[in-house]
Amino acid sequence: MKILGIGNAIVDVICKVNDDFIIQNNLTKSTMKLFFDENEFKKLISNLKIEKTVSGGSVANSIVGISQLGDKAGFIGKVSDDEFGSKYEEGLKKENVEYFYSKKKEKLPTGTCLILVTPDSERTMCTFLGTAGKINENDVSSDAIKKSEIIFLEGYLWDEGEPKKAFDKAINNANKVAMSLSDQFCVDRHKPHFLNLVQNKLDITFANEQEITSLIDAKNFDEVINFSKQLKKLVVVTRGEKGAVAINGEEVVESGIQKNLKIVDLTGAGDLFAAGFLHGYVNKLLTKECLKKGTEMSSKVIQQIGARL
């Protein structure tokens, strides 16, 4: 297998809202908030008009994109034996992704992410992890990890105790490890651990500019470049309208964005960028071509509702 993803198995519920809704519900725009009270989460959804429901989860979105590009890909994530769990499995099988988990009856429902899209196409996420947050080391197949060229992990796995053990097992058995830092607040919650991972455990780090800047307390992007050079590992940073940059030792490669796009929803931009880049990487393309592939995938997904093509 080329790439095996391990992450939160979550169904995305997409709704359009105005900025007032974000403010009234004490949410921080363009970030992800975790909900631990299922009733509070249901109350938030109850008054909204649902635009679309689709299988999601950051790494899972990337893995689907990788499969769509023709690479053999798999995913490990935990769902419950309920309506959303069945929908989740079906969504992966439809995209030819090998799913290394069988849904079971659980006390908690399948994880759900409420994605609130504001008129500027930014997305604010509210997540109830449910069963997704209970993935543990017993759910992770050592054999599948060892047979994969790269495993791809998400920082969100650190938001619950049990997934951390699954995370460690994956890293200890992997040939190569790539990870997305996931979210600026996620970085802030786990900064010392993430910094250790980036410096000592990961082969490839994916981050946006805000995440990597927060991680190292950088005052400007030159500090990000210098930090990344010293790692002598691959660091890939998306910078919004400024494009993306990949740093690997002294090699610094930049890429622009595709212009004149009709942006509808930025939800899957980072996920699909990672998909395109990793596709290029495992097929041994030059770094510049990997960035180009990432930009192409990202540009496609932001012109539609939802994080999957």
Residue spans for each PLM region:
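Conserved beta-alpha-beta core of the PfkB/ribokinase-like small-molecule kinase fold
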Residues: 150-225, 242-244
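Conserved phosphate-binding/catalytic loop of the ribokinase/pfkB sugar-kinase fold
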Residues: 100-105, 115-161
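A short, aliphatic-rich alpha-helical micro-motif
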Residues: 144-146, 198-199, 229
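A glycine-rich helix N-cap at a beta->alpha junction
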Residues: 91-108
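Hydrophobic beta-strand scaffold residues
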Residues: 73, 99, 177-178, 235
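Active-site nucleophile and cofactor-binding loops and adjacent substrate-binding regions
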Residues: 50-58, 103-107, 267-268
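Conserved phosphate-binding/catalytic region of the ribokinase-like
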Residues: 3-9, 15, 23-30, 47, ...
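Glycine-rich phosphate/adenosyl-contacting loop at the front of the ribokinase-like
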Residues: 1-76, 86
